[in-house]
């Protein structure tokens, strides 16, 4: 009701008033869950927000109202009063006129994206440092080649784009490609984002998009999407789900992260659905429906063991320096919130499975006597790697959704 087109301000004005900390592009720290990795996405064109960590979402008035415990009407009044003070509003309007949003391309069909990405990856090398990284994770050279992991190019981007055009590839609508100020096609690779590319494949093995596994994580984020949203002729990658293994398998496993899921597949032989993050459960549903139409009869959730994270305050957590309690309580508020967010996301997946009449169980490992995570083996890929290396790893335990989490 209050987020319509008749407003003379937008969500970026609200963000300015709230003094949210910007990390990159339209990503900010979340004031609701205390995230400091820039997981709150602001969508200026639609005047909406969504946190990929705590899943809070809504319009610009809800963003302000929820933080100040106001009604939408009260929030609207306060925002208007604040913007009418000083010259901020006039300066912001002038800036918007001078910097019009670049025209974006419509997302290209899957077959177009697949061919362009495949040709691009064929032209790229895999640096020794990245090859060693992948081998240390438990992959073989044959598997690395099969998945087409390649290093991010740091120069020659115009020439690479031209080579793809000469091969008959389409670049318009393919995330990561855009036109520079002269109209030449190029690619959104930057030196600060060096790393290796992780193709994200559909059920049928087509490359939908690519992620970059960063050499140097930024704000504790290890992955970035190869995207050109906000650039002339560019487009967003979205957050597609990676699928690897037999698409006709009766039992399918769900985890977080395409690289993790691919490693787990190669180490176990199981079929994996790999969401980009635990809160990306909305993207998981259409994949589950597609696999149900084949032969899938059961889902096994294998998210990281953070879902059983101990919440004791041990004064050893990486958030301790930011905690106002300074270890003066029995439980760590940051651990409690992190565990709540992950378990809530798991619950969303279980809810989707109930709606689809799809049996689902949960897989856990490396637990202590209280059933909490023992802190040694975090991911499903780590678990299978430990098993293969004949290290001490407890047998997996699968529990029904109805059991205590």
Language model features with spans:
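Conserved active-site segments centered on acidic
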Residues: 73-133
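Residue-level preference for well-ordered alpha-helical positions
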Residues: 65, 80, 135-136, 144, ...
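Terminal peptide-recognition signature
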Residues: 30, 51, 64, 134, ...
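TOPRIM fold recognition
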Residues: 1-7, 50-55, 249-252, 260-405
């Amino acid at each position: 009701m209050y987020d319509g087109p008749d407003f003379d301000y937008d969500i970026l004005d609200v963000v300015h008033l709230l003094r949210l900390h910007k990390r990159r592009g339209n990503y900010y720290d979340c004031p609701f869950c205390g995230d400091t990795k820039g997981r709150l996405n602001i969508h200026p064109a639609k005047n909406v927000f969504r946190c990929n960590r705590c899943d809070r979402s809504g319009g610009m008035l809800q963003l302000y109202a929820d933080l100040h415990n106001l009604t939408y009407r009260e929030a609207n009044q306060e925002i208007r009063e604040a913007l009418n003070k000083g010259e901020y509003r006039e300066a912001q309007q002038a800036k918007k006129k001078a910097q019009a949003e670049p025209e974006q391309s419509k997302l290209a069909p899957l077959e177009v994206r697949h061919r362009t990405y495949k040709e691009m990856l064929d032209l790229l090398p895999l640096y020794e440092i990245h090859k060693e990284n992948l081998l240390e994770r438990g992959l073989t050279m044959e598997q690395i080649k099969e998945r087409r992991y390649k290093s991010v190019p740091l120069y020659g981007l115009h020439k690479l784009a031209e080579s793809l055009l000469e091969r008959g590839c389409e670049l318009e609508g393919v995330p990561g490609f855009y036109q520079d100020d002269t109209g030449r096609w190029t690619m959104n690779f930057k030196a600060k984002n060096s790393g290796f590319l992780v193709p994200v494949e559909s059920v049928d093995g087509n490359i939908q998009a690519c992620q970059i596994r960063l050499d140097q994580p930024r704000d504790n984020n290890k992955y970035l999407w190869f995207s050109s949203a906000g650039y002339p002729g560019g487009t967003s990658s979205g957050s597609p789900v990676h699928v690897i293994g037999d698409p006709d398998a009766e039992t399918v496993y769900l985890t977080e992260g395409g690289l993790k899921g691919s490693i787990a597949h190669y180490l176990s032989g199981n079929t994996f659905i790999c969401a980009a993050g635990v809160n990306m459960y909305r993207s998981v549903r259409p994949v589950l429906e597609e696999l149900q139409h084949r032969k899938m009869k059961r889902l096994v959730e294998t998210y990281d063991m953070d879902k059983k994270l101990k919440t004791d305050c041990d004064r050893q957590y990486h958030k301790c320096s930011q905690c106002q309690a300074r270890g003066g309580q029995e439980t760590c508020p940051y651990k409690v919130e992190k565990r709540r967010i992950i378990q809530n996301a798991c619950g969303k997946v279980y809810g989707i499975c109930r709606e689809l009449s799809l049996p689902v169980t949960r897989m856990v490992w490396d637990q202590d006597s209280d059933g909490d995570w023992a802190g040694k083996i975090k991911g499903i890929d780590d678990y299978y790697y430990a098993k293969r290396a004949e290290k001490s790893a407890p047998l997996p335990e699968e529990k029904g959704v109805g059991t205590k989490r």
